[in-house]
Amino acid sequence: MVNVKVEFLGGLDAIFGKQRVHKIKMDKEDPVTVGDLIDHIVSTMINNPNDVSIFIEDDSIRPGIITLINDTDWELEGEKDYILEDGDIISFTSTLHGG
């Protein structure tokens, strides 16, 4: 079991009940990856199926969304293969805003 904090910033909170910070307990047996977390987010936290495409494209985080693992770009940490540790902070920030 892993407890993580997930942040939805840059307007992404709009598809997550207007709540920017969520504490998530992943009950899956170790190891739990960021990919597992993303699957959990999509299957349990996005209420409107039409909103999935705002967050996911081609089975990954949509381009234009910066993903950080403990303030480090997820590309440097192995992206979806990163193994979550208790207390990790995962941030998703949309860079695509209305003007």
Curated annotation (Swiss-Prot):
GO terms for biological process: cell budding; cellular response to oxidative stress; invasive growth in response to glucose limitation; protein urmylation; tRNA thio-modification; tRNA wobble position uridine thiolation; tRNA wobble uridine modification. The modification 1-thioglycine is found at residue 99. C-terminal thiocarboxylation occurs in 2 steps, it is first acyl-adenylated (-COAMP) via the hesA/moeB/thiF part of UBA4, then thiocarboxylated (-COSH) via the rhodanese domain of UBA4. InterPro entries: Beta-grasp_dom_sf, Mopterin_synth/thiamin_S_b, Urm1. The keyword Cytoplasm applies. Pathway: tRNA modification; 5-methoxycarbonylmethyl-2-thiouridine-tRNA biosynthesis. Pfam families: Urm1. GO terms for cellular component: cytoplasm; cytosol; nucleus. It comes from the Eukaryota. Homodimer; homodimerization may provide an autoprotection to the highly active C-terminal residue before attacking its substrates. Interacts with NCS2 and NCS6. Forms a conjugate with the target protein AHP1. PANTHER family: RURM1 PROTEIN. Acts as a sulfur carrier required for 2-thiolation of mcm(5)S(2)U at tRNA wobble positions of cytosolic tRNA(Lys), tRNA(Glu) and tRNA(Gln). Serves as sulfur donor in tRNA 2-thiolation reaction by being thiocarboxylated (-COSH) at its C-terminus by the MOCS3 homolog UBA4. The sulfur is then transferred to tRNA to form 2-thiolation of mcm(5)S(2)U. Prior mcm(5) tRNA modification by the elongator complex is required for 2-thiolation. Also acts as a ubiquitin-like protein (UBL) that is covalently conjugated via an isopeptide bond to lysine residues of target proteins such as AHP1. This is Ubiquitin-related modifier 1. It comes from Saccharomyces cerevisiae (strain ATCC 204508 / S288c). The lineage of its organism: Eukaryota, Fungi, Dikarya, Ascomycota, Saccharomycotina. The gene is URM1.
